[in-house]
């Protein structure tokens, strides 16, 4: 089984790539963000450490973590963003390692793990290779405004904290250019697999 890490800047089209991989290959797909959200649910691995670190003001009435409130706190303070990452990311990675074992036992051909901090969190140690899903900054900004309704200010804040193109290219064996139409993107993927 090949374990492939998928990364790229926000708005690059990683979700479209993952959808294609899920539909066309015998593969297990893991999205680190979704795992992180699951781990934040009451009783799960990161719930109590996050509440302890950020206080009860991040909780909804039903005691679940309000991710919008938490997000607003960490967007405003880089130190708090780093604190949150120190709580969440090691536990997400532990989950991924366990899922790799399970996928191997299930006879999967591929396991794709998508994570924003794939490079920073050293997923190269557990992946056979890393892929960078690329789209230019102007196109990504346009997608984020249109699809997610993000403001320029919010987009700039997010971009500021993400790796630059040259860093992604330095660490990833494969670059999939997702600037054109999706058929071209899918053709590049088929060539690699």
Language-model features, listed with the residues they occupy:
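Hydrophobic anchor at the beta1->P-loop junction of P-loop NTPases
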Residues: 6
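P-loop (Walker A) phosphate-binding loop of NTP-binding proteins
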Residues: 9
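ATP-binding Walker
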Residues: 12
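Walker A/P-loop
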Residues: 15
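Short beta-strand-centered segment that lines the nucleotide-binding/catalytic pocket of NTP-utilizing
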Residues: 27-40
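ATP-dependent small-molecule kinase phosphotransfer cores
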Residues: 37-108
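NTP-dependent small-molecule kinase module
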Residues: 98-110, 124-129, 133, 137-150, ...
């Amino acid at each position: 089984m090949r374990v492939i890490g998928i990364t790229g800047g926000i708005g690059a089209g990683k979700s479209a790539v993952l959808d294609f991989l899920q539909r066309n290959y015998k593969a297990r797909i893991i999205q680190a963000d979704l795992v992180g959200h699951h781990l934040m649910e009451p009783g799960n691995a990161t719930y109590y450490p996050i509440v302890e670190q950020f206080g009860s003001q991040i909780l909804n009435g039903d005691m679940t973590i309000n991710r919008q409130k938490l997000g607003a706190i960490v967007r405003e303070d880089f130190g708090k963003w780093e604190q949150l990452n120190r709580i969440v990311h090691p536990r997400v990675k532990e989950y991924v390692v366990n899922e790799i074992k399970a996928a191997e036992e299930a006879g999967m051909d591929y396991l794709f793990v998508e994570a924003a901090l794939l490079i920073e969190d050293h997923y190269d140690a557990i992946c056979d290779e890393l892929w960078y899903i690329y789209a230019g900054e102007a196109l990504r900004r346009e997608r984020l405004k249109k699809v997610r309704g993000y403001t320029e200010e919010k987009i700039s804040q997010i971009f500021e904290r993400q790796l630059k193109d040259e860093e992604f290219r330095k660490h990833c064996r494969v670059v999939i250019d997702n600037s054109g139409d999706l058929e071209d993107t899918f053709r590049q993927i088929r060539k690699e697999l």
